[in-house]
Amino acid sequence: MLDIKNPIEARKVIRKNEYRNQTAGTANKYVQGNLCILPSKYAMDFASFCQKNPKPCPLIGFGTKGDPSLKDLGDIDIRTDVPQYRIWEKGKIIDEPYDIKKYWNEDLTTFVLGCSMSFELPLIEAGIPIQHIENDTIVPMYRTSIDCEPAGQFSGKLVVSMRPLNSKDAIRSIQISSRFPAVHGAPIHLGDPSEIGIKDIMNPEYGDPPKAFKNNEIPVFWACGVTPQSVLQDSKPDFCITHAPGKMLITDKLNNDLAAL
């Protein structure tokens, strides 16, 4: 884990390519974001997709065409300020670079979506253990059987993140995360993973496998901002750039600024 509390300093380290791993727990009072960068011909459809699917795709920022800065979110250069990226062509990953300078062009538009890491600090402050933070791993994420609402070219399956919790902590996590609708809000499911199409809880499509569940723990599932990557596989736009799962954009916005209560 990158143990830096200030988001500006964290981005400086990432910008210099001195840190390439997951960002959970880094600058943990500040909002982290999922990334999707698209050619302008897809921008309106993707914005509509986010509007129709606010649980997995809560839009917290977007850029203007051809501009790599995101002034509303901080002194950000989207070409360098994420630990690792994914380059997509027609639904397939063709590269996973540590910066996107050679891929950037004047026709690209950046979208930043809220991330569940923003409510993990309130969970920890409430005494709720977060397994992937304790183990310095990437939260496990799963492609479900739940369809997103389609918009234009974009359609596909919902992705969820999972945290093992005991029943008491699961109830408390619902109460706490409900305060943060801009970063996925309350869980969409808890308990039997097969009910949402997950065949093997120990084999996530994204992130790292969870450690063994304790006897009193159940899986708790939140809608996840990696959903666009699932949608890209199905919708197959000509070109797209995303973050690598778990390796997020760290912004200057405070988590508490997104709290609804």
Curated annotation (Swiss-Prot):
Domain of life: Bacteria
Top-level EC class as recorded in UniProt: lyase
Listed InterPro entries: D-Glu_cyclase, Putative_hydro-lyase, UPF0317
Keyword field: Lyase
Signal peptide from the UniProt entry: none
Record NCBIfam families: PRK05463.1
Protein name: Putative hydro-lyase SAR11_0660
Source organism (scientific name): Pelagibacter ubique (strain HTCC1062)
